[in-house]
UniProtKB/Swiss-Prot annotation:
Its main location: nucleus. Residues 114-124 have a biased composition (Polar residues). It comes from the Eukaryota. Residues 9-82 form the TFIIS N-terminal domain. Signal peptide: none annotated. Residues 94-106, 164-198, 207-237 have a biased composition (Basic and acidic residues). SIII, also known as elongin, is a general transcription elongation factor that increases the RNA polymerase II transcription elongation past template-encoded arresting sites. Subunit A is transcriptionally active and its transcription activity is strongly enhanced by binding to the dimeric complex of the SIII regulatory subunits B and C (elongin BC complex). May play an important role in metamorphosis. It holds the Pfam family Elongin_A. It is found in: Nucleus. Residues 127-136, 238-255 have a biased composition (Basic residues). The keyword Glycoprotein does not apply. This is Transcription elongation factor B polypeptide 3.
């Protein structure tokens, strides 16, 4: 109990914080995150009203609205798990409607075949009327005093006894027929319905207390299945039923009028009791939907179905109410015909699915959780860490998600996410990707960055506007741009500092020197060094060039010696002649005769390298040149012979 009270205090603390800091987005996100992690139950939502407070935050755009929607979805799932009767209420009401139709269809052939069983039909109609009357006064019974219940039970007892005395003899003869009829009702309506019908059929012989107990239990059972919206429709239908019963009671005597007056007296009490219940708060036994707890304006689907069921129930009621005086046979036959006609009316209606507003069963809570909330204005998911944890991690609900199977869409999303989680291999920066719509300033900046060479005089645009463009410029482009716009030199020193640190790291700035002047000085030194280096390279290239080839004459000033073999033969055969004068001596002799003769060193005496002096060199035997392949083969053979 202490932990529950502590949890309620924590929830109320965050509720007050949300109401107090309605404009602080960070505070609201903090409170929603804390509420998401708390183990809040349905009774906590009822006592504190935090559901209505958080539901009001869904209208806020942005991260707060998304987080509030997620928290409301979680609470809806929690309520659906804790109280499944709320989700199953429409189907139970639908089953009641079907069983009511089968019950009326089972009673119709009995009324056709047994025209004389007027008293038994009247008893069944009165028991039905009592049960419907008990449904309309269900809230009044639980809170009314004992004196009021005694007076009402006494009047009911008198009314029952007057009818019981007249139909006593007929009931004895037709007990077997009633048992067969009860057997049919068991087959059509089930065990629960047959118990109620058997109690209503045996109420003539039972005491006043037993009938009161059966009505009280039935009213409790119906109370669990009806909501606050159904009660209003029951009031409207009961007022319509009063008018129809008053018309039919004109034919009979005063007891039905007395019954109508009692109903009129009870309906305001029911209304006051229902207002008290709604003021006290929502009760789980009332069948209130989770949307009612959150204070939404929309009405649950179960109320529509219950209203249609109540309409069919009131249509199936007999219009002729039984009177205390004995009714004649024609009157009973007419009442049975009216009951037949009224019971056959619902069957002639169109099926519910073919109606203009088809009534479908509500979605399964698990499916409703997976569906996104419908919005006319689509907004992308905000990239806030708190919201992402709430939406994707779902707090501490990992175990619940692991137990269930994935559907096709979830399995596909899981496969894609696992593929993106793999190790990525760097393959360069992706260019040309625009992840978001650029602004006009960004578009203009990109165009100027691509066309820096075309920029000239700007007309006095501030430096901060042009800075993204000038940061992409080279030093030469920046110099040209400053020539057209000298006013930028005062602010562009930051850009020149970047160029100096990039190109001239080893240099130091002199005193009272700007970064622009330092860059220009370093550039001049670099150019001078380059020019000196270029000149030295050119000079070395001139020196290293190959000299011009010169052809020199051999044996110009000396005698030409014959080869040794020739010299031996000349000595052997005695053919050794006089030594021939040297070429130089011959030239000198000729120069004395002819002054135009060439002297030593004259260019005319130069002989080409390829030219051969056939007179000086004896004609030896010409050797035939061997082919390269043959020469190689012979060399190989000589090498083998040497081995």
């Amino acid at each position: 109990m202490a932990s529950t009270s502590n949890l309620l205090d924590v929830v109320r603390h965050y509720q007050r914080s949300i109401e107090k800091h309605g404009e602080d987005e960070q505070r609201l996100l903090h409170c929603i995150t804390k509420l998401f992690n708390l183990p809040i139950k349905f009774e906590h939502l009822q006592e504190t009203g935090i559901g209505k407070t958080v539901n009001a935050l869904r209208k806020i755009s942005g991260e707060v609205g998304v987080a509030a929607k997620t928290l409301v979805t979680k609470w809806k799932a929690m309520v659906a798990k804790e109280d499944p009767s709320i989700a199953s209420t429409p189907t139970a009401i639908h089953n009641e409607e079907d069983s009511g139709k089968t019950k009326s269809s089972d009673e119709d052939p009995d009324q056709e075949n047994k025209g004389g069983n007027s008293s038994s039909g009247e008893d069944l109609n009165t028991s039905k009327h009592k049960s419907k009357h008990a449904k309309s006064t269900k809230h009044e019974r639980s809170s009314s005093s004992r004196s009021h219940s005694k007076s009402r039970s006494d009047s009911d007892k008198k009314h029952k006894s007057s009818r019981h005395d007249k139909s006593k003899d007929r009931d004895k003869d037709r007990e077997g027929q009633k048992e067969a009829k009860e057997h049919k009702e068991k087959k059509s309506n089930g065990e629960h319905k047959s118990k109620d019908s058997s109690k209503s059929s045996s109420s003539h012989k039972s005491s006043k207390s037993e009938s009161h107990k059966s009505e009280h239990t039935k009213s409790k059972h119906e109370k669990d299945k009806t909501s606050h919206s159904e009660l209003k429709e029951v009031k409207d239908k009961s007022s319509k039923h009063k008018s129809s019963s008053s018309k039919s009671s004109k034919r009979s005597h005063s007891p039905p009028r007395h019954e109508e007056e009692s109903q009129k007296a009870k309906i305001p009490k029911v209304k006051s009791k229902s207002e008290e219940d709604s003021a006290d708060g929502f009760d789980s036994s009332m069948g209130a939907n989770f949307d009612d707890v959150l204070g939404l304006l929309n009405i649950p689907i179960s109320s529509k179905k219950s209203s249609s069921n109540s309409k069919s129930k009131f249509v199936a009621k007999p219009t002729a109410a039984p009177s205390s005086s004995a009714l004649s046979a024609p009157t009973t036959a007419g009442s049975s015909k009216e009951a037949l006609s009224t019971s056959s009316r619902p069957t002639s209606k169109k099926p519910e699915l073919l109606a203009s507003t088809a009534k479908l069963e509500p979605l399964d809570p698990n499916i409703a959780l997976e569906l996104p909330t419908i919005s006319n204005n689509y907004k992308p998911m905000p990239l806030n860490q708190t919201v992402m944890d709430v939406v994707f991690n779902q707090g501490g609900s990992h175990k619940a998600q692991a137990s269930r199977y994935f559907n096709e869409s979830e399995a596909l999303a899981q496969g894609i996410s696992s593929k993106t989680m793999r190790t990525k291999i760097y393959s360069g920066v992706r260019t040309g990707q625009i992840l978001q719509v650029p602004s006009l300033f960004d578009l203009c900046t990109r165009v100027l960055q691509k066309n820096i060479d075309a920029l000239e005089y700007t007309g006095g645009v501030p430096f901060e506007v042009l800075r993204p463009v000038l940061e992409r410029a080279t030093p030469q482009q920046l110099l040209n741009f400053e020539e057209y716009n000298p006013y930028l030199m005062d602010d562009s020193d930051v850009l020149w500092q970047q160029h100096v640190q990039r190109h001239c790291r080893s240099q130091r700035r002199e005193e009272m020197e700007t970064w622009r002047e330092m860059f220009l000085r370093c550039q001049e030194e670099k150019d001078r060094k380059l020019s000196i280096l270029a000149e030295s390279i050119k000079a070395s290239q001139k020196i290293s060039e190959a000299p011009v080839r010169k052809t020199q004459l051999a044996f110009v000033d000396s005698m030409v010696k014959p080869p040794r073999s020739v010299q031996r033969k000349q000595e052997q055969y005695g053919t050794k002649g006089k030594l021939i004068a040297t070429p130089a001596a011959r030239v000198a002799a000729l120069s004395s005769v002819t002054p135009n003769a060439a002297k030593v060193g004259d260019a005319r005496l130069r002989v080409l390298a390829a030219a051969r002096d056939t007179a000086q060199v004896g004609a030896g035997p010409a050797r035939s040149k061997k082919a390269p392949l043959m020469a190689k083969t012979l060399q190989f053979m000589r090498g083998r012979l040497k081995r």
